[in-house]
């Protein structure tokens, strides 16, 4: 355990912050004893994987915990699917590649999403028409309220659009591993025209899951900045889900506004990127805080922007969208050290 630990290297925005205590745990079995240390026993706890879905707008209170368990294995084979277990510290993209190498499908649309396996259920990560919740079998976690390890199935995880019980109760559950139910053959999700076009350019009209993954990798590498080069956390805002009546009223005034089906009946989804671009923010930069010129959803740190400066920049983006469209944007990353 380290005291007064710098966190710049542990978040993909590369903002400066300091942890009062930084604790690394390598196995789930070591977790209860580690959490009982007197320095942190009653302190708030922030779990950081790769720090790809947080904005440190200030120093986190209490202790920062890093899980280092990186074991991956197929734990059950069936006729048409397999159960893959991955430790919370496993790199997400590495798991996608592992599943493809084992002849399994389902995760291909989620290739190259930054972060770790332990973080994927929290946000119910999704991209290009797929979300990880469709393939989660069990989440293994330590329940701090009852001081015991628990196994939560997909229903108990309360997975929604960029939401889960882990996001709703961040102080309760510490995810130590995730089990995935992955099919041997899965109907490919090619709803996004960009993926179909990329597959055609690759000469892969009769696509396999590995081809879809490569198409997604190609698209993401073109559109999204590499966080190792330019600080960012991927998409910063959720796509707004609105009642169909409200969307119809908006489309009457803004006829070119794109609309997509929502996850539930009676709801439609707007493109946050389109809203932000229409308000003139795409490519805009103020100091070292800015919006990527390639993708309006991506907030970037060009060098030395603080978390507080990035948060202020994001708030002003959201306020301009609210004023013009009466639509409220919500951030995807968890905001630490400040309120949204």
Swiss-Prot record:
<dbReference type="GO" id="GO:0071949">
    <property type="term" value="F:FAD binding"/>
</dbReference>
<comment type="function">
    <text>Cell wall formation.</text>
</comment>
<keyword id="KW-0132">Cell division</keyword>
<keyword id="KW-0274">FAD</keyword>
<keyword id="KW-0133">Cell shape</keyword>
<dbReference type="GO" id="GO:0009252">
    <property type="term" value="P:peptidoglycan biosynthetic process"/>
</dbReference>
<protein>
    <recommendedName>
        <fullName>UDP-N-acetylenolpyruvoylglucosamine reductase</fullName>
        <ecNumber>1.3.1.98</ecNumber>
    </recommendedName>
</protein>
<dbReference type="InterPro" id="IPR016167">
    <property type="entry name" value="FAD-bd_PCMH_sub1"/>
</dbReference>
<keyword id="KW-0285">Flavoprotein</keyword>
<dbReference type="InterPro" id="IPR006094">
    <property type="entry name" value="Oxid_FAD_bind_N"/>
</dbReference>
<keyword id="KW-0961">Cell wall biogenesis/degradation</keyword>
<feature type="active site" description="Proton donor">
    <location>
        <position position="235"/>
    </location>
</feature>
<dbReference type="InterPro" id="IPR011601">
    <property type="entry name" value="MurB_C"/>
</dbReference>
<dbReference type="GO" id="GO:0071555">
    <property type="term" value="P:cell wall organization"/>
</dbReference>
<feature type="active site">
    <location>
        <position position="162"/>
    </location>
</feature>
<dbReference type="InterPro" id="IPR036635">
    <property type="entry name" value="MurB_C_sf"/>
</dbReference>
<dbReference type="GO" id="GO:0008762">
    <property type="term" value="F:UDP-N-acetylmuramate dehydrogenase activity"/>
</dbReference>
<dbReference type="Pfam" id="PF01565">
    <property type="entry name" value="FAD_binding_4"/>
</dbReference>
<keyword id="KW-0560">Oxidoreductase</keyword>
<comment type="similarity">
    <text>Belongs to the MurB family.</text>
</comment>
<dbReference type="InterPro" id="IPR016166">
    <property type="entry name" value="FAD-bd_PCMH"/>
</dbReference>
<dbReference type="InterPro" id="IPR003170">
    <property type="entry name" value="MurB"/>
</dbReference>
<keyword id="KW-0131">Cell cycle</keyword>
<dbReference type="GO" id="GO:0008360">
    <property type="term" value="P:regulation of cell shape"/>
</dbReference>
<keyword id="KW-0573">Peptidoglycan synthesis</keyword>
<dbReference type="GO" id="GO:0051301">
    <property type="term" value="P:cell division"/>
</dbReference>
<dbReference type="Pfam" id="PF02873">
    <property type="entry name" value="MurB_C"/>
</dbReference>
<dbReference type="GO" id="GO:0005829">
    <property type="term" value="C:cytosol"/>
</dbReference>
<keyword id="KW-0521">NADP</keyword>
<feature type="active site">
    <location>
        <position position="332"/>
    </location>
</feature>
<comment type="pathway">
    <text>Cell wall biogenesis; peptidoglycan biosynthesis.</text>
</comment>
<feature type="domain" description="FAD-binding PCMH-type">
    <location>
        <begin position="14"/>
        <end position="185"/>
    </location>
</feature>
<dbReference type="InterPro" id="IPR036318">
    <property type="entry name" value="FAD-bd_PCMH-like_sf"/>
</dbReference>
<keyword id="KW-0963">Cytoplasm</keyword>
<dbReference type="InterPro" id="IPR016169">
    <property type="entry name" value="FAD-bd_PCMH_sub2"/>
</dbReference>
């Amino acid at each position: 355990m380290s005291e007064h630990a710098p966190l710049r290297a542990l978040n993909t925005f590369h903002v400066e912050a300091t942890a009062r205590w930084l604790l690394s745990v390598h196995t789930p079995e070591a977790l209860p004893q580690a959490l009982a240390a007197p320095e942190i026993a009653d302190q708030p706890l922030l779990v950081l994987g790769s720090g790809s879905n947080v904005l440190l707008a200030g120093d986190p209170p209490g202790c920062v915990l890093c899980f280092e368990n990186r074991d991956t294995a197929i734990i059950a084979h069936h006729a048409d699917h397999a159960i893959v277990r991955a430790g919370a510290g496993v790199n997400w993209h590495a798991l996608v590649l592992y599943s493809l190498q084992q002849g399994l499908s389902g995760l291909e649309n989620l290739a190259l999403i930054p972060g770790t396996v332990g973080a994927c259920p929290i946000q119910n990560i999704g991209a290009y028409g797929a979300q990880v919740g469709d393939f989660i079998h069990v989440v293994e976690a330590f329940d701090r309220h009852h001081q015991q390890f628990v196994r939560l199935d997909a229903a108990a995880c309360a997975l929604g659009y960029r939401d889960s019980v882990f996001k709703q109760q961040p102080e309760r559950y510490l995810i130590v591993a995730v089990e995935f139910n992955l099919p041997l053959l899965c109907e490919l999700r090619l709803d996004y025209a960009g993926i179909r076009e990329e597959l055609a350019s690759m000469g892969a009209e009769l696509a396999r899951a590995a081809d879809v993954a490569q198409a997604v990798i190609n698209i993401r590498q073109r559109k999204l900045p590499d966080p190792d080069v330019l600080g960012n956390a991927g998409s910063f805002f959720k796509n707004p889900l609105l009642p169909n009546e409200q969307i119809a009223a908006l489309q009457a005034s803004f006829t070119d506004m794109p609309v997509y089906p929502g996850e539930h009946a009676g709801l439609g989804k707007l493109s946050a990127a389109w809203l932000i671009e229409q308000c003139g923010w795409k490519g805009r930069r103020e100091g070292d805080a800015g919006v990527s010129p390639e993708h309006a959803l991506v907030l970037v740190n060009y060098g030395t922007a603080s978390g507080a400066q990035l948060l202020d920049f994001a708030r002003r983006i959201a306020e301009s969208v609210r004023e013009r469209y009466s639509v409220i944007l919500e951030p995807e990353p968890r905001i630490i050290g400040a309120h949204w």
